[in-house]
A protein has these predicted regions:
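Surface-exposed acidic/polar loop and edge beta-strand patches at domain peripheries
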Residues: 1-85, 89-265
Length: 265
């Protein structure tokens, strides 16, 4: 299983309910805050159906926020399409972003690309760090073209970072497999967390590969949709837990994530 399984991690909300993390994949609405982002979803779904190659699931609306999480998973020969929906079932418009979180197994190494845009006199990339992240943390490694974050099961202290991911992919290597998540970046739209459409959270129990939609005002009875595409490749691994840039480039070319040598000039 490329995904983490965490049955112990849980948060107790002010009303006494418990939000279990569980691992795997989950849907949230962003920006993150407590307790709104941690409402328990450990209850039966409102509805589900199978339509051809697609599974469609609607959770029960959250009583406090009146937001309803929706999921449509479509199996395709080349990949899996995962559509994340946030529906406003309340009476007023709400601004938020859809947030897809894939919690990958302990020992995973996550790789994502920097920007290769030639913006002349203007900056072309940024990295965003959360307050509990130590910049010198050895689990993070930064190159010109790619960035690497490694999950160390012996390191419990968390870290989190994000970026404006213009390449639209992130990869997690674990168990001689590579899980790839594809997602969009809409240049003219505003994103949460200092303009992040990609984020990763790392702790001892696993590492998260997260994509975010643009911020959107969701009117009553309207659904905000955000799409991810997933691939899993078997029989592939990194040469070391913290590989060098040239090694990464060769592997990513093999996976079809890098088409040219633009990053390693």
């Amino acid at each position: 299983n490329v995904f983490a399984e965490d049955v112990q991690e849980a948060d107790v909300l002010p009303d006494g309910s418990v939000c279990h993390v569980y691992g795997g994949f989950r849907i949230c609405h962003c920006p993150e805050t407590f307790p709104r982002s941690y409402i328990s979803d450990s209850h039966p779904v409102e509805s589900y159906s199978v339509l051809g190659d697609s599974l469609v699931v609607d959770a029960q609306p959250e009583v406090w926020t009146q937001m309803q999480k929706r999921l449509r998973v479509t199996l395709r020969p080349e990949d899996v399409e995962v559509q994340i929906g946030i529906k406003n079932t309340g009476a007023w418009a709400v601004q938020c972003a859809a947030w897809g979180i894939s919690a990958c197994a302990p020992g995973s190494t996550v790789v994502f690309a920097g920007s290769s845009e030639d913006t002349g006199y203007l900056p072309n990339r940024s990295l965003v760090f959360w307050p509990y992240t130590k910049i010198q943390d050895a689990r993070m490694q930064f190159f010109n073209a790619y960035h690497v974050v490694r999950c160390d099961p012996a390191r419990a202290e968390p870290l989190k970072l994000g970026c404006r991911n213009t390449q639209g992919w992130a990869a997690a290597f674990v168990h001689q497999q590579c899980y790839i998540k594809h997602f969009a970046r809409e240049a003219a739209r505003e994103y949460p967390d200092f303009d992040c459409n990609f984020e990763t959270y790392d702790a001892d129990w696993g590492i998260e590969v997260e994509s975010l939609s643009p911020l959107q005002m969701i009117e009553p009875n309207q659904t905000l949709w955000h799409t991810e595409r997933w691939e899993i490749h078997s029989g592939i691994s990194l040469p070391t837990a913290m590989p060098q840039e040239a090694e990464l480039h060769q592997i990513l070319q093999h996976l079809g994530l890098v088409e040219t040598d633009q990053f390693c000039k």
